[in-house]
Design a protein with these regions (language model features):
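Nucleotide phosphate-binding/pyrophosphate-handling subdomain across enzymes
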Residues: 2-105
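A structural signal for short, well-ordered beta-strand elements
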Residues: 26, 129-132, 164
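A short acidic, helix-capping loop that chelates divalent metal ions and anchors anionic groups
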Residues: 56-57, 161-165
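Phosphate- and divalent-cation-binding pockets in alpha/beta enzyme and binding domains
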Residues: 69, 117-121, 164
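C-terminal helical cap/extension that packs against the catalytic core
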Residues: 95-151
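Phosphate-binding loop of NTP-binding sites
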Residues: 145, 163, 176-184
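Short beta-strands and strand-loop turn motifs
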Residues: 154-158
């Protein structure tokens, strides 16, 4: 099995697979282990691969409710992503997100009460394209317009959900529904 066989991104997931393999070695056939790695899309709302549509991978990381969680998610990809971020303002600093976004984000689609703070953090380090939207529907539509074959769309808000949703699960489920309803 190669690293590229693991469907979910990130060094931490490679480490998780190595630990799991060690735990079941001799009890589970290597072919079964490899098949699981190739097909497991992740835990809901945690860098969860929702679908590949027209060559674009759509990931739901609604659990990314702080800059540090979004930073960890951004660092797990091997290419720049289209980032959907923003939400309720917990009055935390967004400055650490700027340099990471400068290195890992192709376009940022921002919404919610923290949209301005996230934009300021990014602008302090980069002039990457930023699109402002009012809600998740507009964010998904904008990402769909911008995304090209080979791109990754990563919804990781770096913010709480309470300005638009009851919780991160509701936000993630809404994103999932919008992504899954897009025509092939």
């Amino acid at each position: 099995m190669n690293r590229s066989d693991i469907l979910i991104p990130g060094d931490h997931n490679v480490e998780n697979y190595l630990a799991a393999i060690a735990a079941v070695w001799g009890e589970v056939a290597p072919a079964t282990i490899a098949e699981y790695a190739r097909t497991f899309g992740g835990v809901p709302h945690r860098s969860e691969l929702l679908r590949v549509r027209r060559g674009v991978k759509w990931y739901n990381d609604s659990i990314g409710s702080s800059p540090s969680r979004t930073i960890a998610g951004l660092k797990s990809f091997d290419r720049r992503v289209i980032l959907i971020a923003g939400g309720y303002d917990k009055h935390i600093p967004y400055d650490p997100l700027g340099p990471v976004a400068a290195d890992t984000v192709k376009t940022a689609i921002l919404m919610g009460a923290t949209g301005d703070k996230i934009e300021q953090a990014i602008r302090a380090c980069s002039d990457l394209p930023i699109v402002r939207v009012k809600n998740m529907e507009e964010a998904v539509a904008a990402a769909n317009r911008l995304a090209q074959d080979g791109d990754i769309v990563f919804m990781s808000p770096a913010s709480a959900s309470f300005d638009m949703y009851r919780n991160f699960e509701e936000r993630g489920n809404h994103f999932r529904r919008l992504v899954m309803e897009m025509e092939e």
